Every structure is written in structure tokens, then in C-alpha cells.
Regions:
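C-terminal, well-structured catalytic/ligand-binding subdomain of enzymes
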Residues: 3-146
Length: 146
């Protein structure tokens, strides 16, 4: 089936791989004045892969969510306190993200923030407006054990 895989390392190298069973496209990070980010949603965002998107637009506004992320970083709303301001972004404070109140059969499964400096993951399981972001140290612990 189709999928998006987000890859990043501690050095700041990051990409998204948009995949179908027969084709893949590696999408580079988006670079802004205050750094680079990768973002993935429930659809393909590269022009090359859009024709292979099986959702045919029935993707719960994933392109709108993707645009909200890019706009928030390009406008420098996300700066200084990256973790805190990114939590606000994912809660929908800067535009549409996960506000599916009128969709009884669709919910956000989780929202994640990856801190490449500390190798810590912050994750809200469920709607980030209702669920707290908790620290997930599994990656950090795995690397520390070596």
C-alpha cells in the first residue's frame, strides 16, 4: 500500500520518502531562514507522486494541514521555543491541523515532534488539543545502549 516515511538523523539530514508498491520519490527537507523541517501527511505532496495518491482527494484535508505547517515555519511563527510552538501548531493554534470535530469516523491517531539535538520524541496519542504531549525516550535509550 502507499505510505510516507519520514527519515532524519542527529546531524540534521532529513527526507520524506513517498512510496507506492512500484515507485518511490525521496522528497528533500523544506528549508527556511530559521532551519529545515520535514513534514508528512495522509497524502503525497510531491508533484511526481500525486497521480499515485489512492485517496483521490478524500484525505481529510491533508494538503491543508501540510500548508499550515509550511506557512507556520516560513512565517517564523515557529522559532526560539521550537518544541512548545510546534505543539501549538499541532493543536491547531496557527491554522487547521487536527480539528475533526464534525467527522465522527475520523480521528488523529498521534502527533509527533522529533528533537534531533536531544533525540527525544514528543508525542500526543490522539487529538493534541485534548491529549498532552509526553516524552518518548525509546529512541534516545536505544542509542544510549548502543
Amino acid at each position: 500500500s502507499n505510505c510516507n516515511i519520514l527519515l532524519a538523523d542527529k546531524k540534521g539530514n532529513m527526507v520524506v520518502v513517498e512510496c507506492t508498491p512500484i515507485l518511490k520519490k525521496v522528497r528533500a527537507a523544506e528549508t527556511f531562514e530559521n532551519g529545515s523541517i520535514v513534514c508528512t501527511v495522509n497524502s503525497f505532496t510531491s508533484d511526481e507522486m500525486k497521480p499515485y495518491d489512492d485517496a483521490k482527494g478524500n484525505d481529510y484535508d491533508s494538503h491543508r494541514r501540510y500548508r499550515t505547517v509550511l506557512d507556520s515555519f516560513s512565517s517564523e511563527r515557529i522559532k526560539d521555543e521550537y518544541i512548545e510552538t510546534t505543539e501549538h501548531l499541532l493543536k491547531g493554534d496557527y491554522g487547521f491541523m487536527c480539528q475533526y470535530d464534525d467527522e465522527p469516523d475520523f480521528e488523529t491517531v498521534w502527533s509527533s515532534i522529533f528533537d534531533l539535538d536531544s533525540l527525544v520524541i514528543y508525542r500526543a496519542e490522539g487529538d493534541p488539543r485534548k491529549k498532552k504531549f509526553v516524552t518518548d525516550n525509546r529512541l534516545h535509550d536505544l542509542i544510549r545502549r548502543g
